[in-house]
Design a protein with these regions (language model features):
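Fe-S ferredoxin-like electron-transfer domains
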Residues: 29-167
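N-terminal cofactor/phosphate-binding cores enriched in small/glycine residues
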Residues: 1-51
Length: 167
């Protein structure tokens, strides 16, 4: 991802923050590319470049995979009209791919996380979370305060503060 970015190529990314102290994790899969001679696509943010490696960033296969990833993530989001952050990075990536909504089944209402406004100084709204872990890495590795973790497994993963207590 960084080599492509340095050459002016745009590869979408969601779980990678190109800033000092942030390491790529590759878990959102929004940055998939084709590598010549390899059967499977690779997450460009975590793939180490090697001498002679030929990376295809704009093939139909890579574009299709990235588009499907974003479409699956949008299926678990509130509709843009009611989203709390209509200008989020996810929506920017969706716009760049021409996606306004997902054609996949949307998240069931009972699975949408509730707003936590129990603290006087902050509100936590996880309804737009894509479980990428960027907030965890930011707290653990950049801020070095380790106050956010992930709980659950698979599709039922969510960020938690301390012991998943209300704020």
């Amino acid at each position: 991802w960084e080599v492509a970015h340095g050459r002016g190529l745009v590869i979408p990314h969601l779980c990678h923050k190109p800033a000092p102290g942030y390491r790529p994790d590759g878990n959102c899969r929004a940055c998939m590319v084709e590598i010549e001679g390899e059967r499977v696509l690779a997450a460009s943010c975590i793939r180490e470049p090697s001498e002679g490696m030929v990376v295809v960033t704009d093939s139909a296969r890579a574009r299709g995979a990235r588009r499907m990833v974003v479409e699956m993530l949008l299926a678990d989001q509130p509709e843009r009209e009611v989203a709390h952050d209509r200008s989020s990075h996810l929506w920017d990536v969706a716009d760049a791919q021409g996606l306004q909504a997902s054609r996949l089944p949307t998240m069931e209402v009972e699975r949408i996380p509730l707003l936590d406004d129990s603290h006087v100084a902050m509100r936590v709204n996880l309804d737009a979370c894509i479980q990428c872990g960027l907030c965890v890495r930011a707290c653990r590795e950049v801020q070095v305060n380790d106050v956010i973790g992930m709980a659950g497994r698979g599709h039922d993963t969510w960020p938690v503060f301390d012991f998943d207590d209300p704020m």
